[in-house]
Amino acid sequence: MGKTYSSPINPIPKAPKGLAIHHWLNFLQAAYRLQPGPSEFDFHQLRKFLKLAIKTPVWLNPINYSVLAGLIPKNYPGRVHEIVAILIQETPAREAPPSAPLAEDPQKPPPYPEQAQEASQCLPILHPHGAPAAHRPWQMKDLQAIKQEVSSSAPGSPQFMQTIRLAVQQFDPTAKDLHDLLQYLCSSLVASLHHQQLETLIAQAETQGITGYNPLAGPLRIQANNPNQQGLRKEYQNLWLSAFSALPGNTKDPTWAAILQGPEEPFGSFVERLNVALDNGLPEGTPKDPILRSLAYSNANKECQKLLQARGQTNSPLGEMLRACQTWTPRDKNKILMVQPKKTPPPNQPCFRCGQVGHWSRDCKQPRPPPGPCPVCQDPTHWKRDCPQLKTDTRDSEDLLLDLPCEAPNVRERKNSSGGED
């Protein structure tokens, strides 16, 4: 019987060891263009073949898919021949002169030109054979796997875009799915910038006209959520991907994104600093208000964030956020820090040591009384170590020792050498 393979946990199969991730993504994109779509067995055979081909690196530096095709054994199982054939066919298109903007634009790295796929099995849109298309929301394992692939890439970078394009091509998400994916992968600042650029692109597309778009049926975003509107869904996906190209600072966050509210700084002063920095640092034509609202909450100190969360104003107009945080000032914080714990009142009973009222026995400055009379003189007012009679006896014994006769040194040496007197 043939081998069976369980469904992969990661929606994007892992690259073979020794193969660069961008080369592996090219193989995956070619595999997803197969008709009918690739099976798990095809991916297994592709990984198995590439592990062997890496040991013969003549096709890697530079990469040459024609040489790689010659390394495929005859009657090799799976569809590795077809995948490599697609790569050979598309290689000239990706190496075209600069007149081809799709291949040379750093914001749009290869993928290959997307083609409509018929009756393909993809998620969250399901196309079961002989049944209408159905929608299935994202599963957390899918989102986690995609985020793991782009964790080391900045939003909008070539590596980030290549992975996201592959995920969109594989899963065929709706407009709502793309919104959820953006919120999961990117910060609130990046999501706000992307949303503004996407709204501009959608308005232009609706004005110019899109095949299959009906203005009477609602906005493009609503129509793209219909599982049966595959053409409009593809158009919306392209607009969603294109919106990443307008993100300022794809490699690192701009300077104004690092402005934080100090622990003692009033919220109004912090917002004013943000406003000035955005006026001086935002690219021309970029809307300022959504970025200012996003940073006013995300970069505020913990006290102000708690106030905004309690009132449900994390993304409210800036005036409402300022009024909400007026209840917190550094003076209020100092008052809270000056509150001291209540001290325990002194006892009403006399102290066990000195007999006075007003303090506890553990705080008494008088020495602790002895538990009983002195065993030497029977005096109950002192300890044995402080007995004057004991000190007198010790002094008398020392005086007696001083009165004893002392032998001369030569006599003592003579006794020691002879072993003592007879």
Curated annotation (Swiss-Prot):
UniProt GO molecular function: nucleic acid binding; structural molecule activity; zinc ion binding
Leader sequence residues: none
GO CC annotation, single: viral nucleocapsid
Disulphide-bonded residues: none
UniProt key word Repeat: yes
Keyword Lipoprotein: yes
Functional note: Matrix protein p19 targets Gag, Gag-Pro and Gag-Pro-Pol polyproteins to the plasma membrane via a multipartite membrane binding signal, that includes its myristoylated N-terminus. Also mediates nuclear localization of the preintegration complex.
Record's protein name: Gag polyprotein
